[in-house]
Amino acid sequence: MMQNYNYKYYEPLEQMIAVRHQYMSKIIKKITNLNIYEYLKNKKILDIGCGTGEFLKNYHDLNNQCLGIDIQHNFKFKNKIGFTLKNTDFKNFIKNNKKKFDIIFIFEFLEHLSFSDREFLFKNLFKLLNRNSLIFISTLNKNMISKFLAIDVAEKYLKLLPKNTHDDKYFLKPSEIQNLANNNKLHLIDVSGMTYNPLFKSFKLSKIDLVNYFISLRN
C-alpha cells in the first residue's frame, strides 16, 4: 500500500483523470474510428511517471496489461497479474527493459526532466513501441502565464503543490516536443490545451494551450 506522504499533493493530478480519458477518447476515435473501450482491450500499456497508479489502474480494469514506473514509491495498489507498479528511475527501466508496448502515457512528467534526460527518453521511446502504437503526453507550456499560474499561484498561493515542485526553465513549448518526436521517428497526431477550474477542482479540454496541454504521437 501507499507509504507515508501528503496525499493532498496528488489531488491535482488525480483531478486530471477524467480529462486525460476524454482526450485519449478523442484521439482514438479520430485515428481508429473506435471508441476507447473497443480499442483498449488486451493492450500493453506503460505509464512513465505513474504517481500513485490511480490512472493506470482504470485501464487494467479494462483487461489490459499495465506497467507503471515512478521514482517515488507512493503507490496506492499492490501488484497482481497484469498490473505492475515499479519503483525505478526511467533511465534504468529503459536500459533493462525488453518489453514492447501498444500505448505509453507520459503525463505531467517531461517538465521535471533535464534537457539531456528528455533527449534520452525520446531517443529510446521508439524502441519501446509495437507497430501502430500511441503515446499520450501532458505537460506545461513555456511562457510567463504558465510560470505565474503553475508556480506563483498553484505552489505559493493556493499551495496545491509543494514549493519548488516546478522549475519553469524545464517547461516545454509544444514545438519542442514536436521537434523531439520528429528527430526520433515519431509523428505528431494532435495538440490540445486544457484549462483548470479551481471552484469545481476540474480540468476540461480547451483550444487554449498557454498553460497545460496534451500532445499525442504515433510511430
Annotated model-derived regions:
Residues 1-97, 103, 107, 119-122, ...:
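Conserved N-terminal segment of class I S-adenosyl-L-methionine
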Residues 5-7, 154-163:
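Short glycine/proline- and charge-enriched loop/turn segments
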Residues 66, 135-136:
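A short hydrophobic/small-residue beta-strand
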Residues 108-112:
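Short catalytic micro-motifs in class I SAM-dependent methyltransferases
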Residues 119-131:
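A short glycine-rich, Lys/Arg-flanked "PGG" loop and its adjoining helix->strand segment in the class I
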Residues 136-158:
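Conserved class I S-adenosyl-L-methionine
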Residues 159-176:
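Acceptor-substrate binding/catalytic loop of class I
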Residues 179-182, 187-219:
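A C-terminal cap/extension of S-adenosyl-L-methionine-dependent methyltransferases
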